[in-house]
């Protein structure tokens, strides 16, 4: 007879004694269990003791997390969190450098546990650490020359403990002094400092900026972009990542009036070129966290365009009207417009109206009215002027080429530019905040200081080319825009490394090629809608679904590394989960770093029997998505969240690294529970595999027309005299 579900069998260690095998009754209070363990080893004052995991996490067992204890778990009897916090609080103030160093090392490790962190913070431990950072450097300045390694380790452990303690969100960031901020900033500003100290200092500065408006002001006074740039020119990708994260944080929290100023500083300091040279084109792979920070920087840079995108043109503003006059002048090189009053006003108005019509504006009389719609507002006019000035030959050619065509066949440059600018803003999501999980950056946008304008210049020439290839008329304007959008989107998915490469990709995506792609997709769709094919699909679909199911389960057996997210930032903290080969148990556990390849089952400390799983929930239904916090409200995170519910009020919470892994895991878990696999990935895989299988089966019928209906059954004969009776 199996043991009751409330009983778990564990091993408990105590230094200097043989481990004990015990059965823990989860219905009993934790204090009663600890007393029982202490009595077994004849230890008095059981209230001074606690249980913690014996694995590398060393997390304390509490009433909140005790349900995570599984059969076979190894626990350790140790001093209680309150006692441990009190002892460490005293030890880190020791006059002995060795004792202080050892205490800070222990503190850095234990601070990851929220139970211990709460007790240490209650002793005003955060203030003690900040005082050590502020004054400790001066106090031990004389010792640095003879004890430099010891001093570096001490400061590193102090900052690590501080980061871990603050990461729990117990203490407000607004409580820190200017002296502390200056000290942290000084570590970042030093040219030669220990890597671990630099990394933690950058992490602290980023958190200060993101979590407090007041601290943003103070950090911005202490740290300049020029002081951060040398860290990007190094070879340590983690330092580069944290440096860009600080720049992004300063950018994100800057007041509107300061963002453009900051962008100008970034341009002066050649930040883009340095990132392109030392990060994007460095001889090493870009990890996910770096890709995310580059994506954030890309989004924040493009969001600088939002102000112009949402600004309507003022038809009465002479400076703005002069831009339109400049477009006309460059295009038609107006021959010494009479400065005197010789030409009549009516003649000049007529000439302007004719030229504005050639420029493709909708309102020929007052083209300023074309820019009153937002988006794209004044951004469209900015793009047109940039194209006219920096690609003058192409601009003049397009305008004159179209002005010489028949009215109905001309590609209106003005209208096209306005609609194209609006479309490009939609593609690049200008004005939207960066996602917490996305890492979709485009290297080509880091190759030019005016990348959006250059992007526009390439696309407006593409639009003109596509217009000619389609032999379009004014009625076809929307169709042309749809084709151009498809061309741009298909070229962007290839992630070109430069704007020139993007241009060459577009050359290969002519209107004829787009038609071929569309026709191929349409033919495939039509071919597979006939009745015989649909019947064949229905027959082989169960085989394909079984194949997909096996692939999903095989991927779960291989396992996936999940990233632990919190309200502060995306951390380099990982945990791994994989299914046992017999599909009966999920093995999972924390990791110190991202693994290279599969993690063996033996190294994963925790187990969850598949038979115990009650349900799999996703999105807002997940327990960890119902918690309060800025991160939890993010739409992208919600779309990647899922949870396994088991036992009573127990859950295993996941946030997938990307949409693909989310689909793999939700499909696989549903398959284990005997439920349908409902993800988009399953639908796509099913369509692809069904299509391939049907094509393979129909190879022998090539060029043979398959009828839509079976042949008719012939009429019965008039008599059956032809029947031969063997008897």
UniProtKB/Swiss-Prot annotation:
Compartments where found: Cytoplasm; Cell membrane
Function in brief: Involved in cytoskeletal rearrangements required for phagocytosis of apoptotic cells and cell motility. Acts in association with DOCK1 and CRK. Was initially proposed to be required in complex with DOCK1 to activate Rac Rho small GTPases. May enhance the guanine nucleotide exchange factor (GEF) activity of DOCK1.
Gene Ontology annotations of biological process type: actin cytoskeleton organization; actin filament-based process; apoptotic process; cell motility; phagocytosis; phagocytosis, engulfment; Rac protein signal transduction; regulation of postsynapse assembly
Broad class of where this protein is predominantly found: cytoplasm
InterPro entries attached to this UniProt entry: ARM-like, ARM-type_fold, ELMO_ARM, ELMO_dom, ELMO_domain-containing, PH-like_dom_sf, PH_domain
CDD domains (UniProt xref): PH_ELMO1_CED-12
Superkingdom of origin organism: Eukaryota
GO molecular function: guanyl-nucleotide exchange factor activity; SH3 domain binding
Subunit structure: Interacts directly with the SH3-domain of DOCK1 via its SH3-binding site. Probably forms a heterotrimeric complex with DOCK1 and RAC1. Interacts with PLEKHG6. Interacts with HCK (via SH3 domain). Interacts with ADGRB1. Interacts with ADGRB3. Interacts with DOCK5.
Signal sequence range: none
Entry comment on modification after translation: Phosphorylated by HCK.
GO cellular component, as recorded: cytoplasm; glutamatergic synapse; guanyl-nucleotide exchange factor complex; plasma membrane; postsynapse
Residue positions where Phosphoserine is found in the record: 344
Domain ELMO: 319-492
Motif (SH3-binding) on chain: 707-714
Entry-annotated residues carrying N6-acetyllysine: 100, 105
A Pfam family the protein falls into: ELMO_CED12
Protein name: Engulfment and cell motility protein 1
